[in-house]
Amino acid sequence: MRFNTRFIAGCLLVACAGWPLSGCGLSALSDDPDTLYASALRASLDQEHTESARAAFHYMKSTNPDNVRYDRAEKLLAQNVEALGLDYAASLFYLDIAESRRDVRLVGDAVGALERLLRRDGYDQMTLRDGFLARAEITGLAPNERAFVAYHQGLDSLRNNLMDWATERFSQIPKTSPYRHRAEYALIIHSLATYELDEVLERLEVLSQAEDLPDDLSNEIHRTLGRIGFEQKRFDDALREYELIRHTATDDPSLLLEMAWSNYYLGNYQRALGLLVALDAPAYSGLIAPERYLLEALSLEQLCQFEPARIAATRLRARHGHALDDLHAKTPLRESSAIRAAARHRESGRAPADFRRHMRHEAAKFAEIREQFGPQLAQHLDQIYAHGLQEAERREDAQLFGQMREVSEELLTAEEGVRLVLHELAVSVLRGRERDQADPLYRNIEVPVGGDSVFYKFDGEFWTDEVDNLIVPLEDRCVE
């Protein structure tokens, strides 16, 4: 369900005859529309944002949407609440201007503002992207805004498997637009469903060499190349791609986990263990990946470090014991706070969770400055944020259940893996420390006496610029 922008207009048109516009600490506003509009414009130029927003809102209340300056006043209102950090309210005002098309001269400005807001975290994805941009029929936009709309409409068509529509929308994006490369990447990723990996690789390699690639898109391209290399068991190639982006994707702990798996399959057990230790950094505490404990145990097992491997395997229960207990007790998923907390950190569930967190943060920010808006605008913003918070909670609950099911399945699978590893460890102890010939060749890492690299002993303190360089130089106790 998307936010109905008629709700905004309806609130704005509520009769307000006789409302006092002055209050404690607030300047009185004129009842003359021309004076109100001039006051809003002057205050905006002087960066008096609450005063400008008050005057613009009162002007809108004193007239109707057919007024020639109604949308200009709403634009002033949107710009000033945005300047105050109230992005959600601003997005709805911009959306009303773009969607209603009362003043076609302002539609492009409103769409450009929506583009700016969509670059930020925690925006209302369902209302702005999936509701308006995906289906809007807007003409007369400048090339940049036209490319922005075409890109999002093409993405929506791809999500609905409407390939012809997606191709047609993407073809409208000029070659010089930054959205052109994003559209090409989206088409390539969609073609992965055909499993024609060689063709996909070739197209990705070409795209990765394009000029002026945004950093986030470049990271995604190399990440995808790395994942394809991993699936094709080209682990050296996968690591090469991951190494290209690890210093520009420091906020993505799942990248370290993928690097750890690649190192494990190459026999780089010390390096794999170092990357897994890095995942214990407080900055990465939100990562929910039960498999990491299995990988740690498997890496230690390959070094015939049987007791550390056993301890590593049991860390799964130490970290997710409450969630596992709920699963074994057959607690309904919606009633498990442990599984709910884990699901909120899932990448696919991050958008609704971010929207909810952002709404709470922004509502708190509004509450701090509420009295500066005067009673009428404050009441209107109260309604907007009350509705937005309710909708954010509803959306997260709706999507979170699917994430909770995925987390539950991963936890149970990892728990079964732990049982198998513990069994293998028991067998290995009886068998001795002879290395299985089927295992990859162990690559020992030794600290050199000289050289260009400097090695430091890890003291338990994590530093962002060093966290992905950790190595665990455990002794290989296996016998060849």
Describe each model-derived feature in a short phrase.
Residues 52-53, 90, 166, 200, ...:
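Single-residue signature of alpha-solenoid repeat helices
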Residues 38-39, 76, 112-113, 145-152, ...:
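"A position-specific structural signal for the A-helix of alpha-solenoid helical repeats
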Residues 49-50, 87, 163, 197, ...:
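TPR-repeat structural position
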Residues 43-44, 81, 118, 157, ...:
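Residue at a conserved register position within TPR or TPR-like alpha-solenoid repeats
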Residues 56-58, 85, 89, 93, ...:
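Extracytoplasmic/secretory-pathway proteins
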Residues 26-29, 59-67, 95-104, 132-143, ...:
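Solenoid-like repeat scaffolds
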Residues 24-92, 104-111, 126, 148:
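N-terminal leader/linker segments that initiate helical-solenoid repeat arrays
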